[in-house]
């Protein structure tokens, strides 16, 4: 959900990045990502939580998250499903993730 400019009172937190997954672990990575997204989307303060594959290279997975606040993101990091997901990463990923955190104070629809 893209929040409109009027809806952004405090900084919304956006997390965006990518990671390369192991070819032999792709099916397991998809299952883990789906479970993580399902659990995370139920969290208070989560506006969006998505994984997607690169169209040119299906071993590259993108992550996009939107959080109402830094506090909501911190609560997310302390959840049992986050701990379980992080514990699975070594068997799923082929290298370090490139992930950025953005603090957004305004947003407007394009076009």
Where do the protein language model's features map onto the residues?
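Residues at secondary-structure transition points
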Residues: 20, 24-27, 31, 58, ...
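Glycine-rich beta-strand-turn "strand-cap" elements at beta-sheet edges
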Residues: 2-13, 51-59, 87-111
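Intrinsically disordered, low-complexity acidic/polar segments
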Residues: 26-28, 72, 108
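An amphipathic, aromatic/His-enriched active-site/gating alpha helix that lines ligand/cofactor pockets
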Residues: 35-47, 66-100
């Amino acid at each position: 959900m893209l929040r409109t400019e009027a809806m952004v009172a405090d900084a919304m937190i956006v997390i965006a990045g990518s990671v390369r997954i192991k070819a032999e672990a792709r099916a397991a990575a998809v299952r883990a990502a789906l479970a993580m997204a399902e659990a995370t989307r139920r969290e208070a303060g989560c506006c969006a939580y998505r994984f997607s594959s690169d169209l040119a290279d299906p071993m590259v997975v993108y992550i996009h998250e939107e959080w109402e606040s830094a506090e909501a993101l911190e609560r997310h990091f302390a959840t049992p499903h986050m701990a379980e997901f992080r514990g699975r990463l070594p068997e799923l990923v082929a290298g370090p993730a490139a992930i950025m955190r953005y603090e957004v104070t305004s947003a407007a629809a394009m076009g």
